[in-house]
């Protein structure tokens, strides 16, 4: 996976709480098991007025011209709730998002995000309120998300955030479960050499 140390990106405000995984990527688009191709269906029922996805909803925030190319999603509490599907972070990253900022996340979505190099940043309700006001008052604003120093730079203010040290290490070094295993390849090989033949 790609390393994540710091990201500067355009912020799009999705002013909704309890955004569930079926809203993020509706079930009819879950036929594939590869990670690509889901971005076009992200928030399908909100982005489009028709089932075929040919008529964009001009009122939906992702369809606003000044948010084209956004890579940081600002949302409300309990983001990613609902059924467990890894396709949700797949759709977000395939669309181009690198970071989701919210007061809270559903546990399974939170874990799946790290596994797919999508950084979920938890800030307080009050801090998220401030960020919504900032974005609403200044369309096209960029935030700097610094994972190494665990801080979001938004305008003239900095917002520190907490993150598990192991997950932080994995994202900074671009490590998934396979990458973590390969870090210990020499030790694994040495261990296998010392095992009885019938165990190999």
UniProtKB/Swiss-Prot annotation:
GO biological process, one term: L-leucine biosynthetic process
Pathway assigned to this chain's UniProt record: Amino-acid biosynthesis; L-leucine biosynthesis; L-leucine from 3-methyl-2-oxobutanoate: step 2/4
Reactions performed catalytically: (2R,3S)-3-isopropylmalate = (2S)-2-isopropylmalate
Any Pfam family matching the protein: Aconitase_C
GO MF term list: 3-isopropylmalate dehydratase activity
Enzyme class, spelled out: lyase
General function of this protein: Catalyzes the isomerization between 2-isopropylmalate and 3-isopropylmalate, via the formation of 2-isopropylmaleate.
Quaternary assembly: Heterodimer of LeuC and LeuD.
UniProt name for this protein: 3-isopropylmalate dehydratase small subunit
